[in-house]
């Protein structure tokens, strides 16, 4: 069984005499920076000129510097800007400001695993990947808890990379819930697979197909929306809280029986093969190459698809219904 590291296993003092630069002040950036500061770590924020986040970071009491300055002055530099921006930022502002023994950190392995960022041999390269969005990382921290995380060491120049990355994980509150060791390869490939096959791509297509099946059969659009999309949160929350057994305990016996006899009629071997194909494209770099190319060419297909999805019938029905749900406001 994989080992989990908790508060008692990690020494936060490792970071107390270091300066940490958090590059980016978005979802994860604000959470990492504030949690580290609350734990007594010296934190500065590195942002590009004209960043919309600069004012917010200053209002939150942080010293804001350019990415280059923050990198140069820090002992640990955490890259928290979006994946598609990291290569450019690294090449222009980080690469030439790294010094021997510095720690270069990431919250996702994409750019290291797919060789978009190629650090020099004289730095440690690590990852701390919280298993939750930034607002949750911050919110549960303020309540005395934490979001679990994965950690990895890609390059250990100082022979102290593991204690450094674990201290960082403790600094953001992750060891309160537990952190699990992985590799950049495993984190990247499993994270992308989960997003594409289940959490985002898979669930979106399942919902849309269920909705369309009911509407095509003559049922009201609003009823189809409630049954196939709105109630999804109720079920997912139960699974999140206590696994499939909690969900099945909480639903009716009729629903549970339908789960057993019909689930496999929908998610067939064809779906399994589709998942395998998705995983292979992640493993062999085909997906990464396509995403990198999409960004290099201006995101035309990406933005077109986003617009098309916004204008689908189910999206319009959802917006109308949610506008009448006062409890969502």
Curated annotation (Swiss-Prot):
Residues involved in substrate binding: 252
Higher taxonomy: Bacteria, Bacillati, Bacillota, Clostridia, Peptostreptococcales
Protein name per Swiss-Prot or TrEMBL: Ketol-acid reductoisomerase (NADP(+))
Catalyzed chemical reaction(s): (2R)-2,3-dihydroxy-3-methylbutanoate + NADP(+) = (2S)-2-acetolactate + NADPH + H(+); (2R,3R)-2,3-dihydroxy-3-methylpentanoate + NADP(+) = (S)-2-ethyl-2-hydroxy-3-oxobutanoate + NADPH + H(+)
UniProtKB keywords: Amino-acid biosynthesis, Branched-chain amino acid biosynthesis, Magnesium, Metal-binding, NADP, Oxidoreductase
PROSITE patterns, sorted: KARI_C, KARI_N
Amino acids binding Mg(2+) 2: 191, 227, 231
Gene: ilvC
Residues binding NADP(+): 25-28, 51, 53, 83-86, 134
Comment on bound cofactor: Binds 2 magnesium ions per subunit.
Active site residues of this protein: 108
Gene Ontology BP terms: isoleucine biosynthetic process; L-valine biosynthetic process
Family: Belongs to the ketol-acid reductoisomerase family.
Pathway membership, UniProt: Amino-acid biosynthesis; L-isoleucine biosynthesis; L-isoleucine from 2-oxobutanoate: step 2/4; Amino-acid biosynthesis; L-valine biosynthesis; L-valine from pyruvate: step 2/4
Top class in the EC scheme: oxidoreductase
InterPro entries: 6-PGluconate_DH-like_C_sf (IPR008927), KARI (IPR013023), KARI_C (IPR000506), KARI_N (IPR013116), KARI_prok (IPR014359), NAD(P)-bd_dom_sf (IPR036291)
GO molecular function terms noted in the UniProt entry: ketol-acid reductoisomerase activity; magnesium ion binding; NADP binding
Keyword Metal-binding tagged: yes
Cross-referenced Gene3D superfamilies: 6.10.240.10, NAD(P)-binding Rossmann-like Domain
Gene Ontology cellular-component terms listed: cytosol
Source species: Clostridioides difficile (strain 630) (Peptoclostridium difficile)
HAMAP family according to UniProt: IlvC
Domain spans labelled KARI C-terminal knotted: 183-328
Entry-linked PANTHER family: KETOL-ACID REDUCTOISOMERASE, MITOCHONDRIAL (PTHR21371:SF1)
């Amino acid at each position: 069984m994989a080992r989990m590291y908790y508060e008692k296993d990690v020494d936060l003092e490792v970071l107390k005499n270091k300066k940490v630069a958090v590059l980016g002040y978005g979802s994860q950036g604000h959470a990492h920076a504030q949690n580290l500061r609350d734990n007594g770590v010296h934190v500065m924020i590195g942002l590009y000129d004209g960043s919309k986040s600069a004012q917010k970071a200053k209002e939150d009491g942080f010293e804001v510097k350019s990415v280059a300055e923050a990198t140069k002055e820090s002992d640990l530099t955490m890259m928290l800007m979006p994946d598609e921006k990291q290569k450019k930022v690294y090449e222009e502002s980080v690469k030439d400001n790294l010094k021997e023994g510095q720690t270069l950190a990431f919250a996702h392995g994409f750019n290291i695993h797919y060789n978009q960022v190629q650090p020099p041999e004289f730095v440690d390269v690590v990852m701390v990947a919280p298993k939750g969005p930034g607002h949750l990382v911050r919110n549960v921290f303020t309540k005395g808890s934490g979001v679990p995380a994965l950690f990895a060491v890609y390059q250990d120049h100082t022979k102290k990379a593991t204690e450094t990355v674990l201290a960082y994980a403790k600094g953001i509150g992750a060891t309160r819930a537990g952190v699990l060791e992985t590799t950049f390869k495993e984190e990247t490939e499993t994270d992308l697979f989960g997003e594409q096959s289940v959490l985002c791509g898979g669930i979106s297509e399942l919902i849309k197909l269920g909705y369309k099946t009911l509407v095509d059969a003559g049922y009201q659009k609003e009823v189809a929306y409630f049954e196939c999309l709105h109630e999804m949160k109720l079920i997912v929350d139960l699974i999140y809280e206590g696994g499939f057994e909690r969900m099945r305990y909480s639903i009716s016996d009729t629903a549970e029986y339908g789960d057993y006899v019909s689930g496999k009629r929908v998610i067939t071997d064809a779906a399994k093969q589709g998942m395998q194909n998705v995983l292979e494209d992640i493993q062999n770099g085909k997906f990464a190459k396509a995403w990198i190319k999409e960004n290099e060419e201006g995101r035309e297909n990406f933005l077109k698809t986003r617009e098309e999805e916004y204008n689908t019938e189910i999206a319009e029905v959802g917006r109308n219904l949610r506008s009448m749900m006062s409890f969502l406001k």
